[in-house]
């Protein structure tokens, strides 16, 4: 075998995806053409930009286009572009393997979608992971790719039948750009495999999926001219026809663009297979002129929380593509928004570094952000089901904005929804919470934890449930952080049920005299426990938030909770956790029994061991981790043995 010809195996994840394509049961196999045309369009965008920025690049950009060629006899379909092209290494990296991030999650989600025979979910995944090239194997039993990078002399030929391996070789005398040739599977109407050598079929697919592509999509078509004389024969000629209108959707009035056109454009720029949840069309005139077409997706991408994930906004200047992931146009907490911004008064030679300082970009970003947030607000007030879909998919990300976007913090707080003890199914806004507050209640109560069930079983919640106070249940990691930034809503302070002191005695169950008497009765025990547990706690006091549990651990009003400390440590910041406060339920048998035992035999080691067990159970009840699990287990086993 030629030294420059190799047979390689696909990466494991790629083989699984290929298997899904080859044995596809999708009804919508037509969409493979959209994916290949989108890839070709991207290649042309990149070449034009590179040629503008690199004056030494010797390429002809006067006739950039996409060519579709069919061969009915050979049953092949070729999509060709004269764009940027790829090197051999890029072919292996982009086609032989999947993107470096998210491969494990892709493997798991593909398996689940395939096992459930969930066509919609599987199609969505393909677009989500940006691997539409593989969809060629839905309709082809062999795929050939020929590509030459602009400015390079050597070309690369890639070929695979989708069975786990591919061949790659270096070739000479290839045109600049990329061509993908599909050796089509036999037509099968039952399996939705159409005749993709049909001129009518190809034209209809281009019109449906890719009419808005900015580059001409050309194909040689047949023209029939009727006979001019009776008894004569019709004349058949062939000519090249441009199949798409090439109209920029964002430049057209919204009332002239159909819903279907918006959907297909979204799928093109977002590499998505599902429909957007909402379309936002904007046009600004005046100091800064720009047009924007933005989309709120209906599903979160797999890499939503990946720091290296690309943002979804494309920047154009006077309809010339500048960059595909312009993170300066949208705040990070709105990174899920997809779309296009076309500015009129910027230099084509703009760079990311320049954008960071550009006054116009900052102004556009502010306006886009406010428009997206106002659109979400409209969903919340007018289309509640769509808002709930949005919040389920993107709520965790939006809450990040509470920590970073102080200009819009008030709006963001109003947009947020939270689980609460009021309802198992329905989330609540803070405004709705305030409307339901009990008479005399002055604070908005909340609890943080890993899951709803964990919080509901927390000792901290007992008195709040018993007295009918609604508590917000915050289970996202970001919740631990933003509650330290947003301290009040509508004049009502936010109060953690596990921090500081809370007064729930407004109903007058106990008089102050009774509480003073309890304090006197337990004073010796509290002082002894503080000394005995001094390695773990800074204070021991009686609690009015416990009804069933013997004890719970509390953090100072302005202290860092253990969960927040874990979050900081996970991000590389070593935050020390201060000692906490142990609160006791003065009516619990264990606490009253411990008080009596301390009075009777304070020097008995078993009494001190009981104090350790009391502290350990409080720690475990809130989902914490014991400092010395073996010691705790030893004491507990000894106590259990004595009961037998």
From Swiss-Prot:
Residues 567-644 are annotated as: C. It comes from the Bacteria. Gene3D superfamilies: 3.30.230.80, 3.40.50.11260, Heat shock protein 90, C-terminal domain, Histidine kinase-like ATPase, C-terminal domain. It holds the Pfam family HSP90. Residues 1-352 are annotated as: A. It is found in: Cytoplasm. Signal peptide: none annotated. InterPro entries: HATPase_C_sf, HSP90_C, Hsp90_fam, Hsp90_N, Ribosomal_Su5_D2-typ_SF. Residues 353-566 are annotated as: B. SUPFAM superfamilies: ATPase domain of HSP90 chaperone/DNA topoisomerase II/histidine kinase, HSP90 C-terminal domain, Ribosomal protein S5 domain 2-like. One of its GO terms (molecular function) is ATP binding. Keywords: ATP-binding, Chaperone, Cytoplasm, Nucleotide-binding, Stress response. CDD domains: HATPase_Hsp90-like (cd16927). GO terms for cellular component: cytoplasm. Homodimer. Belongs to the heat shock protein 90 family. Molecular chaperone. Has ATPase activity. PANTHER family: HEAT SHOCK PROTEIN 90 FAMILY MEMBER. This is Chaperone protein HtpG. It comes from Mycolicibacterium paratuberculosis (strain ATCC BAA-968 / K-10) (Mycobacterium paratuberculosis). The lineage of its organism: Bacteria, Bacillati, Actinomycetota, Actinomycetes, Mycobacteriales. The gene is htpG.
């Amino acid at each position: 075998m030629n030294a420059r010809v190799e047979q390689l195996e696909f990466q494991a994840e790629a083989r699984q995806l290929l298997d899904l394509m080859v044995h596809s049961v999708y009804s919508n196999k037509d969409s493979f053409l959209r994916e290949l045309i989108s890839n070709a369009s991207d290649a042309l965008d990149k070449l034009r930009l590179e040629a503008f920025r690199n004056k030494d690049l010797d390429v002809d950009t006067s006739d950039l286009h996409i060519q579709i060629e069919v061969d009915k006899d050979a049953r092949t379909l070729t999509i060709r572009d004269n764009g940027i092209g790829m090197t051999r290494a890029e072919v292996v990296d982009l086609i032989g393997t999947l993107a470096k991030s998210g491969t494990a999650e892709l493997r798991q989600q593909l398996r689940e979608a395939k096992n459930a025979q969930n066509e919609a979910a599987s199609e969505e995944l393909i677009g989500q992971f940006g691997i539409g090239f593989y969809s060629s194997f839905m309709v082809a039993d062999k795929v050939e790719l020929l590509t030459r990078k602009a400015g390079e002399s050597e070309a690369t030929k890639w070929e695979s039948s989708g069975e786990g391996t591919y061949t790659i070789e270096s070739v000479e005398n290839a045109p600049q750009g990329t061509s993908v040739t599909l050796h089509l599977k036999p037509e099968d109407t039952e399996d939705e495999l159409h005749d993709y050598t049909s001129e009518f079929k190809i034209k209809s697919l281009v019109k449906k999926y890719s009419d808005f592509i900015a580059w001409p999509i050309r194909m040689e078509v047949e023209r029939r001219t009727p006979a001019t004389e009776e008894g004569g024969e019709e004349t058949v000629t062939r000519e090249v026809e441009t199949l798409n209108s090439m109209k920029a959707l964002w430049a057209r009035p919204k009332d002239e663009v159909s819903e279907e056109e918006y959907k297909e454009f979204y799928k093109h720029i977002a590499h998505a297979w599902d429909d957007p949840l909402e379309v936002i069309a904007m046009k600004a005139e005046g100091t800064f002129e720009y047009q924007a077409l933005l989309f709120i997706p209906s599903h979160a991408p797999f890499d939503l929380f990946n720091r290296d994930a690309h943002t979804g906004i494309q920047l154009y200047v006077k309809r010339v593509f500048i960059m595909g992931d312009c993170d300066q146009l949208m705040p990070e907490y709105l990174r899920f928004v997809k779309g296009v911004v076309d500015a009129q008064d910027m230099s084509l030679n703009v760079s990311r570094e320049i954008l960071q300082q550009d006054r116009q970009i900052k102004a556009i970003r502010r306006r886009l952000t406010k428009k997206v947030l106002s659109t979400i607000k409209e969903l919340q007030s007018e289309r509640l089901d769509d808002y709930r879909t949005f919040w389920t998919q993107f709520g965790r990300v939006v809450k990040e904005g509470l920590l970073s976007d102080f200009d819009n913090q008030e709006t963001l707080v109003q947009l947020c929804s939270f689980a609460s003890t009021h309802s198992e199914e329905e989330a609540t806004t803070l405004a709705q919470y305030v409307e339901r507050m009990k008479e005399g209640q002055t604070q908005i109560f909340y609890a943080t934890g890993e899951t709803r069930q964990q919080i509901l079983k927390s000792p901290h919640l007992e008195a709040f449930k018993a007295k009918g106070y609604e508590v917000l249940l915050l289970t996202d990691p970001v919740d631990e952080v933003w509650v330290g930034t947003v301290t009040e809503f509508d004049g009502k302070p936010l109060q953690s049920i596990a921090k500081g002191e809370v007064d729930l005695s407004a109903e007058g169950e106990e008089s102050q005299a009774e509480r003073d008497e309890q304090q006197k009765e337990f004073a010796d025990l509290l002082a002894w426990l503080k000394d005995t547990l001094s390695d773990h706690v800074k204070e021991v006091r009686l609690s009015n938030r416990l009804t069933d549990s013997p004890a719970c651990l509390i953090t100072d009003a302005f202290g860092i909770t253990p969960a927040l400390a874990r979050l900081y440590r996970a991000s590389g910041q070593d935050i020390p956790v201060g000692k906490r406060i142990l609160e006791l339920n003065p009516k619990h048998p264990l606490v009253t029994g411990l008080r009596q035992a301390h009075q009777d035999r304070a020097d008995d080691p078993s009494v001190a061991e009981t104090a350790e067990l009391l502290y350990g159970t409080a720690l475990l009840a809130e989902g914490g981790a014991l400092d010395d699990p073996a010691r705790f287990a030893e004491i507990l086993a000894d106590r259990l043995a004595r009961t037998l």
